[in-house]
Curated annotation (Swiss-Prot):
Pfam families the UniProt entry points to: tRNA_m1G_MT
Source organism per UniProt: Acinetobacter baumannii (strain ACICU)
Keyword Transit peptide: no
Locations listed in the record: Cytoplasm
E.C. code: 2.1.1.228
Family listed: Belongs to the RNA methyltransferase TrmD family.
Official protein name in the record: tRNA (guanine-N(1)-)-methyltransferase
HAMAP family linked to this entry: TrmD (MF_00605)
Gene3D superfamilies per the UniProt record, alphabetical: 3.40.1280.10, tRNA(m1g37)methyltransferase, domain 2
Length: 246
């Protein structure tokens, strides 16, 4: 999958390309992550990419022209890589909140061009003409779009085929089917007086699967009850709940 990131701080994305699951995916050429600095497309000796906002007010606004040139360059690179469906995504607190369903849709794309804002944001005309989607990672403000962009890339990359060493691990993640994940345990059997649930050591896979589902359902009900209404349960899961509730 092709990713082009428009950012003033390309070095930050070594966190994606050099480490962990996403780093291994990059080394294996499952993903291509290219960072494009809009300063390279700015004019003048200082290569400015920001200016004071019209109408006054605090801070600076990123200028449309260097960003547009950077996006067009990214589109050329995507075309050279054989990618057809490559939307431009702007990471913004004003965008829709990212969730697992959106991530799964991104997985089906050929690639993404991700725009990282800075300062007070981006000239609205650039958004109107070049941005296809705006996404947020939550109702709070960060110093720039780089961290949200890394969240987006990591969440997509780990869902791509052949990226995870254990495909089942990704399938069982929180939110994949609308439920939170179940509690996880590893060695030792006892830690500070707390034991691993016996059922997890029983080797009875069907009972373990049932236990994990019931734990996930109960945890979601307690911590994120608004998610329960959106969950579609299988026939087996409904039976497990019915048995548990007597």
């Amino acid at each position: 999958m092709f990713f082009a990131v428009i950012t003033l701080f390309p070095e930050m994305f070594e966190a994606i390309t050099a480490y962990g699951i996403s780093g291994r995916a990059a080394k294996r050429d499952i993903v291509q992550v290219t960072c494009i600095n809009p300063r390279d497309f700015a004019e003048g000796n200082y290569r400015r990419v920001d200016e004071r906002p019209f109408g006054g007010g605090p801070g600076m606004v990123m200028m449309a022209e260097p960003l547009a040139k950077a996006i067009n360059h990214a589109k050329q690179l995507a075309s050279q890589a054989g990618c057809v469906h490559v939307p431009v995504v702007y990471m913004s607190p004003q965008g829709k909140t990212l969730n697992e369903q959106a991530v799964q849709q991104f997985v089906d794309y050929d690639g993404l061009i991700v725009l990282c804002g800075r300062y007070e944001g981006v000239d609205e005309r650039l958004i109107q003409h070049y941005v296809d989607q705006e996404w947020s990672i939550g109702d709070y403000v960060l110093s720039g779009g780089e961290l949200p962009a890394m969240v987006l890339l990591d969440s997509i990359i780990r869902r791509l085929p052949n990226v995870m060493s254990d495909e089942q691990s990704a399938i069982q993640d929180s939110f994949v089917d609308g439920l939170l994940d179940c509690p996880q345990y590893t060695k030792p059997d006892q830690f500070e007086g707390l034991d691993v649930p016996e059922i997890l050591k029983s080797g009875h896979h069907a009972n373990i699967e049932k236990w994990r589902f019931l734990q996930r359902y109960q945890r979601t009900l307690e911590r994120r009850p608004e998610l329960i209404e959106q969950v579609t349960l299988t026939k087996q899961q409904k039976k497990w709940l019915s048995d548990e509730q007597g």
